[in-house]
Amino acid sequence: ISTLNLGTQSGSLKHVFQKYLKTSLVADKLASFYGTHSIVIGNKYMFFTPEYTTLNGEKVTNLNSFDDGAIVTNDGMLIFFENGAGWNGNRLYIHIDVNGFNKRPNRLGYDVFSFQIDQNGRLLPMGAKGTFYYDANDKYCSQNSTEAYNGIACAYKAISDSSYFKNLKN
């Protein structure tokens, strides 16, 4: 995967998605700003303080892998992008908060699911073999795990295990 441009020029990720989605907001950048995040659209900012928790309910204190861009769809779904060129080996992550950050529980593995685009351009559910957060012992998708990103690797289980949602604790 080559480094993706998340900015405003032609050919950027923003323009790629804008062609295919009717979106209410397309972010040029998501940036930390005094403890809040802002979706920047041209010269307008939408400020918010996203509070996400792990699968077991612990607060996620580091949202660095959610901060390279975002799209808010007309129905409120929030799609985050992470272009990890450099720090994680040119991996591209897509995180989807299916009901948006204004609706709870905002919990990894419950209403927030992550995907990775691999070196061959395949979209993989996080937790599948070959993804960055794959772990045979489920340390990134276990209601008992204390990992900082516990729940980030649950997309694979949610797709492949028909009882996944029945077994989730509220």
Language-model segment annotations:
Residues 1-15:
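Membrane-proximal N-terminal amphipathic helix
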